[in-house]
Curated annotation (Swiss-Prot):
This is Ribosome-inactivating protein TAP-29. It comes from the Eukaryota. Keywords: Hydrolase, Plant defense, Protein synthesis inhibitor, Toxin. GO terms for molecular function: rRNA N-glycosylase activity; toxin activity. Capable of inhibiting HIV-1 infection and replication. It inactivates eukaryotic 60S ribosomal subunits. It comes from Trichosanthes kirilowii (Chinese snake gourd).
Amino acid sequence: DVSFRLSGATSKKKVYFISNLRKALPNEKKLYDIPLVRSSXSGSK
């Protein structure tokens, strides 16, 4: 019973974690990718 309850909790946490990642990814890409591209472009030039 304990192992089953733990597996159920982890599966729910995984779904919740993935949903949060999907929500955060677009924002992180806009915040981090653009500055990285600008810095890398200016550094290469």
